[in-house]
């Protein structure tokens, strides 16, 4: 319990992803919240296969710009392929993990923070009311006897991009998002996405060490 709390504090202190580009805004993918948890479970179930996908994604880099299909202006990264290469090595050494239960309680807690940032245009894990991820989960009836965690991505409009960028964790020195998502301690997750006036979109994913978020 204490170690999970310490881990969460480290994750909260990690720098946030800067994933927006100057391309025209796109609508959020239909059903993106459940797709995010499913995509993360796919990566957890077979990290080696996901590493192979990242090797193919790596070929889209030109210096620090990623030129994905349909994006004529590219996506600027901080580290270029260095972060991708590190993620590939991490995944190659990572054992398969059981799936996270997609939990409504955690999705609601994530939705509270995403909606707050939609209104405020702010970033980070702290709510405008001073709430932490653990406090928001408790307000929804969870996290009382469990460890909790949270990751946030800004900019992507589809689940695959959200999960991929959090796993690569470009610009985050301690790779806190990646380590949290592959922690064997967590057993449940829930995601929520909303529009964000500064970064197009904000996607929040909350985690719990209990199977139902409680």
Model-predicted regions and their roles:
Residues 2-12:
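Bacterial N-terminal signal peptides that target proteins for export
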Residues 3, 37-38, 171:
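Helix-centric, low-specificity signal for extended rod-like, repetitive segments
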Residues 6, 24-25:
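Intrinsically disordered, low-complexity serine/threonine-rich segments
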Residues 16-17:
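Classical secretory targeting signals
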Residues 20-22:
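N-terminal signal peptide c-region/cleavage motif recognized by signal peptidases
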Residues 26-142, 178, 184:
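Short, well-ordered surface patches within globular domains
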Residues 103-212:
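A well-ordered secondary-structure block
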């Amino acid at each position: 319990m204490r170690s999970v709390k310490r881990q969460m504090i480290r994750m909260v202190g990690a720098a946030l992803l800067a994933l927006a580009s100057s391309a025209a805004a796109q609508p959020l993918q239909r059903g993106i919240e459940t797709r995010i948890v499913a995509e993360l479970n796919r990566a957890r179930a077979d990290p080696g296969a996901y590493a192979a996908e990242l090797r193919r994604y790596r070929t889209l880099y030109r210096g620090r710009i990623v030129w994905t299909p349909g994006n004529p202006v590219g996506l600027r990264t901080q580290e270029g392929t260095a972060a991708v290469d590190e993620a590939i090595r991490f995944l190659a050494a990572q054992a398969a993990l059981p799936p996270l239960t997609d939990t409504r309680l955690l999705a609601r807690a994530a939705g509270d923070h995403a909606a707050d940032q939609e209104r405020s245009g702010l970033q980070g894990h702290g709510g405008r009311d001073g709430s932490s991820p653990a406090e928001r989960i408790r307000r929804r009836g969870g996290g009382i006897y469990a460890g909790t965690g949270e990751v946030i991505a800004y900019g992507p409009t589809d689940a695959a991009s959200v999960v991929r960028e959090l796993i690569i964790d470009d610009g985050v020195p301690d790779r806190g998002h990646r380590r949290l998502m592959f922690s064997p301690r967590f057993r449940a997750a829930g995601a929520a996405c909303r529009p964000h006036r500064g970064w197009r979109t904000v996607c929040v994913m909350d985690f719990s060490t209990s199977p139902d978020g409680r």
